[in-house]
Amino acid sequence: MPEMPEVETVRRTLRPLVVGKTIDHVDIWYDKVITGDPETFKRELKGKTFTAVDRYAKFLLFRLGDLTVVSHLRMEGKYHLTTWDAPVDKHEHLQFAFTDGSSLRYADVRKFGRLQLVETGTEFQVTGLKNLGVEANSPEFRLDYFEKGLKKRSMNIKSLLMSQTLVAGLGNIYVDEVLWQSRINPLTPANELTKDQVKQLHSAINETIEEATKYGGTTVHSFLNAEGGAGHYQEKLKVYGKEGQPCPRCGEDFVKIKISGRGTTYCLHCQKR
């Protein structure tokens, strides 16, 4: 699943491709890609112009004046620019056809991604954004906020970070990475972390998100940006996907377990309970 650095990379590559373009019409080839009524989606967007492409955590926000399209890529969602009349691939589910003859298409092999049309300004009340915590590596993600939030929660730290309810934007890749960097066992209850561990984890989250974004995200399966380019942070990963390989810090082999249904790789020596 694209995490915050990947979605930010998509946003940055999408912005120059679509901002200023006016929608002639919208084609929807898979109705379930739309949260809400597909016909309303098509009707309301006709004649609208893309004014900005924003992001919150893992969500893209396409701004069209008084309307916003909130897009969650989920596991495999991708956007790319093409033309109205280009052949439609079986994994392409929607296109914004622009008045200049180009089109922005949404493709999704798994069909998990969703787009929702809302009035601009209501996106944090009526979409999945309403359930999210503050963004990682943002001014709102203060150390005192993080400390207080952790103290109120007894679930294990891996599951809490994956839930997006305290801090939003991290997924399986970066959670494994930041816990390893902080020497925290992923099964540790959040409210049992020491003050030093919380401080280390807070720093690791911010630094990892910033660095991964600088490298264009991580491509370990199929992630591509809007220009069709892969990320490069996979070359920097220390723990994710390295089950059975030696920990670069202590030399002990990484192990992999499941926590809340998600594969979790960590070092038994460096990340003791």
UniProtKB/Swiss-Prot annotation:
Q: What does this protein do?
A: Involved in base excision repair of DNA damaged by oxidation or by mutagenic agents. Acts as a DNA glycosylase that recognizes and removes damaged bases. Has a preference for oxidized purines, such as 7,8-dihydro-8-oxoguanine (8-oxoG). Has AP (apurinic/apyrimidinic) lyase activity and introduces nicks in the DNA strand. Cleaves the DNA backbone by beta-delta elimination to generate a single-strand break at the site of the removed base with both 3'- and 5'-phosphates.
Q: Which cysteines are joined by disulfide bonds?
A: none
What are this entry's molecular-function GO terms? 8-oxo-7,8-dihydroguanine DNA N-glycosylase activity; class I DNA-(apurinic or apyrimidinic site) endonuclease activity; damaged DNA binding; zinc ion binding
Q: Which co-factor is required?
A: Zn(2+)
SMART domains recorded = Fapy_DNA_glyco, H2TH
Q: Which organism is it from?
A: Lactobacillus delbrueckii subsp. bulgaricus (strain ATCC 11842 / DSM 20081 / BCRC 10696 / JCM 1002 / NBRC 13953 / NCIMB 11778 / NCTC 12712 / WDCM 00102 / Lb 14)
Question: Where exactly are the transmembrane stretches of this chain?
Answer: none
Residue ranges annotated as zinc fingers (FPG-type) are 238-272
Catalytic residue list: 2-3, 58, 262
Q: How is the cofactor bound?
A: Binds 1 zinc ion per subunit.
Could you identify this protein by its name? Formamidopyrimidine-DNA glycosylase
User: Could you describe the subunit structure of this protein?
Assistant: Monomer.
EC number, as in UniProt: 3.2.2.23, 4.2.99.18
Record family assignment: Belongs to the FPG family.
Q: Which reaction does it catalyse?
A: Hydrolysis of DNA containing ring-opened 7-methylguanine residues, releasing 2,6-diamino-4-hydroxy-5-(N-methyl)formamidopyrimidine; 2'-deoxyribonucleotide-(2'-deoxyribose 5'-phosphate)-2'-deoxyribonucleotide-DNA = a 3'-end 2'-deoxyribonucleotide-(2,3-dehydro-2,3-deoxyribose 5'-phosphate)-DNA + a 5'-end 5'-phospho-2'-deoxyribonucleoside-DNA + H(+)
Keywords tagged on the record: DNA damage, DNA repair, DNA-binding, Glycosidase, Hydrolase, Lyase, Metal-binding, Multifunctional enzyme, Zinc, Zinc-finger
Name the residues that bind DNA. 91, 110, 153
Give me the gene this protein comes from. mutM
Question: What processes does the entry annotate via GO biological process terms?
Answer: base-excision repair
